[in-house]
Amino acid sequence: MSNSQLKIKTKALPNSRIAIEFEVPAQQCKTSFEDALTTLCKSANLPGFRKGKVPKSVILQQIGSKRIQASALEKLLEKIWKQALKEESIEPLCEPELAGGFEPLLENFNPEQTLSVTLETDVAPIPKLKTTKGLTTEAEPITFDESKVDELIEESRKQLATVIPVENRPANHSDIAILTFKGTFADDGSEIEGGSGESMEIDLEEGRMIPGFIEGIVGMKINETKTIDCQFPKDYQDEKAKGRKAKFDIQLQDLKTRELPKLDDDFAKQASDKNSLKELRNELTNRLKSDAKNRNKKNRQESLLEALVKELEVDLPKTLIDEEVRNLIEQTARNFAEQGMDIKSTFTQDLVSSLMESSRPEAEINLKKNLALNALAEAENIKVDSQALEEKIKEVNIELANQKNIDQKKLRQVVQNDLLQEKLFDWLEANNTILEKKPKKALNEKVKSSKPKNTQKKTDKTKKDSP
């Protein structure tokens, strides 16, 4: 009970939600009704009366008591809500919801009687960790693979290659084939959507198309026609095509190949800002080593965080989940826009609804990760040293010297969050165990070696097919 008049009682609900139960005395209800009536009298424009001089009895007759009661009830709810926030120290995450709805409440509202009403709202969750130490988890190690340096150099050579016609030989792997083709499903002969093309350029590289397609073209001669048997993978993105066998009627119209530049210092100068092939190799080696180190660190951190989340006890409020879902959808939209896609036509109502549903698990995981780290900082009293913070802010400002209108308040918050996260992961690594998980594969993320000064010299614009 907060005072002798208005009675306020709070009750915890599931999903970090609270109910605020009010018992509003009859006198307060009556006062609210009288205030609403007085306000209408002052603002009403009725024929035969001066503005502000309309008698209350006339207002009641012309407008009706229910409309006045509705206005009184709205003002009353607003007032008691603000009072509850102040007296009960409530920090809501969203606007209050009236239990039972407004219309039923209005129907039973009598300004001469005590009013019982309940408002509900989401509040910040209180995360708790069952334990923070002695956890055991696994992380896949990422190591530097020197063969990737050669792969990146070969990729640059391909980008700088001259495309020349092929004569008097069949198609080989790594050639560029100009094809006209039509695909049908083997089981019913129906045409494959997106499975046809005319005069389309295709790189004859393994894994570029569905299994059997490239292999069927290798060995063909210019102007030769052929039917190729293929099968769509079971995990193919198109549900209609998954695992189905297909036939492609193909005509090889033309054939080209790449003439690669010599692997020497001139190539290094053309492919990058380095003066020699040795310098280029050293730069690529350092980049790949740095990338492997960073990915290894990220793997370890993600593994520790996943283990910590398993120890988390928290109820997630719908408000925070919905907010994070919106953030994920907005990020998806930005990614699409960066790829040149038309957001307005792409993001239909059906797609947005689908994304809202499919993004929910990821949104919940993101929230739990953040809350787990917050709970760790609280439980173990992990803080950012003020001197370290100031030094880092100074360092970042030097790096951003050429940028204008930097929001220093936001910058401070970002830097502080980054430093705190680093300290939290250092603490987790020092107090828990990470076992080495057998790697699925070596590092195969491609790091761009350089910014080529010249693009690949092609006689026609390359087109990509969908199979």
From Swiss-Prot:
Function: Involved in protein export. Acts as a chaperone by maintaining the newly synthesized protein in an open conformation. Functions as a peptidyl-prolyl cis-trans isomerase.
Keyword Cell division: yes
Record family assignment: Belongs to the FKBP-type PPIase family. Tig subfamily.
EC number: 5.2.1.8
Location of the protein in the cell: Cytoplasm
Gene3D superfamilies given in the database record: 3.10.50.40, Trigger factor ribosome-binding domain, Trigger factor, C-terminal domain
Keywords: Cell cycle, Cell division, Chaperone, Cytoplasm, Isomerase, Rotamase
Domain notes: Consists of 3 domains; the N-terminus binds the ribosome, the middle domain has PPIase activity, while the C-terminus has intrinsic chaperone activity on its own.
Full protein name: Trigger factor
Composition skew (Basic and acidic residues), residue ranges: 457-467
GO CC terms, sorted: cytoplasm
GO molecular function: peptidyl-prolyl cis-trans isomerase activity; protein folding chaperone; ribosome binding
Any one biological process term the GO annotation gives: cell division
InterPro entries linked to this entry: PPIase_dom_sf (IPR046357), PPIase_FKBP_dom (IPR001179), Trig_fac (IPR005215), Trigger_fac_C (IPR008880), Trigger_fac_C_sf (IPR037041), Trigger_fac_ribosome-bd_bac (IPR008881), Trigger_fac_ribosome-bd_sf (IPR036611), Trigger_fact/SurA_dom_sf (IPR027304)
Main location: cytoplasm
Region described as Disordered: 439-467
Catalytic reaction(s) noted: [protein]-peptidylproline (omega=180) = [protein]-peptidylproline (omega=0)
Domain PPIase FKBP-type: 174-261
